[in-house]
Amino acid sequence: MQPVLELKGISKSFPGVKALSGAALRVYPGKVMALVGENGAGKSTMMKVLTGIYTRDTGTVHYLGKEVIFSGPRSSQEAGIGIIHQELNLIPQLTIAENIFLGREFVNKFGAIDWRKMYQEADRLLKKLNLSYSSHRLVAELSIGDQQMVEIAKVLSFKSKVIIMDEPTDALTDTETESLFRVIYELKSQRCGIVYISHRLREIFEICDDVTVFRDGQFIGEKSVKELKEETLIEMMVGRKLEDQYPRLNLPRGKKRLEVKQISGPGVTNASFSLYSGEILGISGLMGAGRTELMKIIYGALPKTQGQITLDGTPIVIRNPQDGLACGIVYISEDRKRDGLVLGMSIKDNMSLTALRYFSNRLGGLNHKEEQNAVSDFIKLFSIKTPSMGQVIGLLSGGNQQKVAIARGLMTRPKVLILDEPTRGVDVGAKKEIYQLINQFKKEGLSIILVSSEMPEVIGMSDRILVMCEGQISGEFFAEQATQEILMAAAVGKQYGAIQE
């Protein structure tokens, strides 16, 4: 089969950095090509070279059998190569149709906008994607998943032959992800070639036909998904074996640190559990099971309607996150961009934001030297890749942003660290580094709650595992007992005997 798009021998250098060296990518009609690699592997640079944002130093781009040079995103878009970015580019106050045809409105013979034709064409595009809602709806009324469908319709309005999806499920629920996959199958049936950029290996094995792997700006290989195992793909991405991807430490646990008795609140009913010093307690369950809600109740971000929380044997009252921090409970959000980090601020300011009281002098001012020393120590300890602590955090990779978020929590010297989806959107190499940091905290006696949708991660890192279903704890297991089948059964409400304390 001839590729609809082929990039060969692509090289691109910036001052002091070789971003791409002999990189290659082929996209076939009616097939999904995954493009994978660690953060910094060159995936984004390759897409910018393809669409003309960057000029390539060497190499060729062939599209529909002809060599092409695009002058920028508009020329590649008009040629039929569309990109759906991780950050959606829609105007909430406009309708779906207005967003799809913004700057390309249909005009009648009198020079006025032909609204009827525009809405008819927008409705036709939505129908092509098997979407039932009207193009008269405002984008602001749509979920993130539906907004992404509008982006796909917008790309199709250019009669795109190739569609590039950059981390398309990053902000989607499980249901929205299923809807996206249905649309991808529909696009395949229409002979569209799709480039699927993702860190989520499970999705790659579910939706993609072939995989292209980049490492350090170089093309490592192209394989059929059917020929690959997950371990082999990870080895190709990181250049080393990852047999010890989950380096769990088997250490004796300490004294009881936290006890939660009959807690209820938004999305949670009668939850009870204990947590010990030097222990990692995994929390598993399906989307909407109440895992995040339970953690936010404990931390004070959601109201508790009944129950008691005891810390080191003393009952505590937590009305808000400030109370939680004061008691020594830190919550690292699953959505670091919305709840965790201020992307326009520096690494230093983000890291020390909740711990400024530790750097204040007797006059109430800040001891900047102490603050800088502490931030510098954490940057070294966490191996955060940055030119300086003054770097704007929004420019860091997802893995390095997550390390800063965790470091900020540790700066407050907590007793309990709650990590909600700590490796979401993080590449496999950075995941391993985060696991090693979690083990270091465990060695030091910190009590850790690890909330994760990735069952291998929960089983691989936890000492004990709680499973939630419909707001209740439906199972409790030692890690040695746990399998993905057992956890899934508990997650859908099938009863397994909980372990005894």
UniProtKB/Swiss-Prot annotation:
Pfam families: ABC_tran. It is an enzyme of class 7 (translocase). This is Ribose import ATP-binding protein RbsA. SUPFAM superfamilies: P-loop containing nucleoside triphosphate hydrolases. Its main location: membrane. ATP binds at G37, E38, N39, G40, A41, G42, K43, S44. Part of the ABC transporter complex RbsABC involved in ribose import. Responsible for energy coupling to the transport system.
